[in-house]
Amino acid sequence: MEKPNNTITDVLEGIVTEILVRLPLRSISRFKSVSQTWKSAIESVYFRRLFVSLHQNTSSSWSLLLRKEEFIDFHGCGTWGLPKSLGSYIQCMELDGKFEYMWFSGSNGLILMHRKLGTWKNYVGNPVLQQWVEIPACPGSYTFFCGVVTGVDEVGVVLSFKVVKSGNMFLNKGEMYMPLYVYSSETGFWIHKEVVCPVRLPNFYDPISLNGTLYFSQRGDSYNRRPGLMVLDFYGKPKDCHFIPLPDHALNRNKTCLATSSGFVMYIKTLAQPGGNLLKVWRLIDDSAWQLMWEVSIPFIGCYAPMSMHPFDRNIVYLWSHDNCYLMSFNLQTQNYKIFGDESKHHDCYINHRTCEKHMYKISRPYSVSEYEGPIILQQWVLSRWMQSVPRPPEVEMIDTTSLLSLVVKNEE
């Protein structure tokens, strides 16, 4: 990292930089309008890397959602300093006037939205910065979205994104093939390829996007004897689509969920059983094997369903009490817990108890062995650690609406 030159002007600029870099991103964004010099300084690689380095131990804002409904939100972090929940930025989103858009997938602060009615326009963007890139129509017929993945640099700044769609599967020489259409922000074009699919009837709902890879939860059925994850990597080494069974599986009433934490896909399971109730947590290693991280005896865990994990702290798991209808965070290392009650008492977070109660009963209700529906998956919308503009293809115009950070972000040339 280069240091400023030792001149009076550079020393003064260095002092200003040292002050600004310790502010939250919401405050820093306002100083970009002071002058072109300040704007250039804030958008420099030096400033960005210094900010990320100083805030590396601070959580970024994040939220748990199901479609556009928000369950829980932590927006009062030091990185962004947002005044309200992340979900409220999606609710305020206005594109194409009155048309309603639906959340489909998210990765590193970017989300993929598609319009419910009329022409099927689709956008990838950042609702907080209010920047959007329109995705052109896919050349394939009868396609549907799989998700969005992102490519990042060494400090987690988003450099590019890819939108993935799939077509109708077909049988060839005894193997099932899946057509894939991939749109890249680096080229502005769709490419088509076909991969051998290890799952005969794949599920593409509620994808998990992490490290340039899409993970799709697959239920156990007559074709897939064990539930697991179908994995598609779009930024790593070229691989065919492959399947990973979930660990320690049995078709029973034990509640499970899938989430991400500290850069890993995590699998959480509660076991209500004679002789002791357990909470078990695994992480996925190299997209090939599960590693058991925690096995904790918790007497009261039988009436709880796992919801998710903290995206930056792999010791924190979030549980929902069916009996008492409240949210609880549990620290696996210290075994301390916190019950979230009246949301008015939490100034830096938002808990939507009505949404939690309605949907958690529906998606984790008691079921019989024959009705096994797989792990709970809630979308973790996590803002990146820097307010970089949404990557856009060459010659494609950025759509900028009024920024909810009190800043109109203009296209970068």
Swiss-Prot record:
Keyword Methyltransferase: no
InterPro entries, A to Z: At3g26010-like, At3g26010-like_b-prop, F-box-like_dom_sf, F-box_dom
Record-annotated F-box domain positions: 5-54
Kelch repeat spans: 168-210
SUPFAM superfamilies listed in its UniProt record: F-box domain (SSF81383)
Pfam families attached to this UniProt entry: b-prop_At3g26010-like, F-box
UniProt KW keywords: Kelch repeat
PANTHER family attached to this UniProt entry: F-BOX DOMAIN-CONTAINING PROTEIN, F-BOX PROTEIN INTERACTION DOMAIN PROTEIN-RELATED
Protein name according to UniProt: Putative F-box/kelch-repeat protein At4g22430
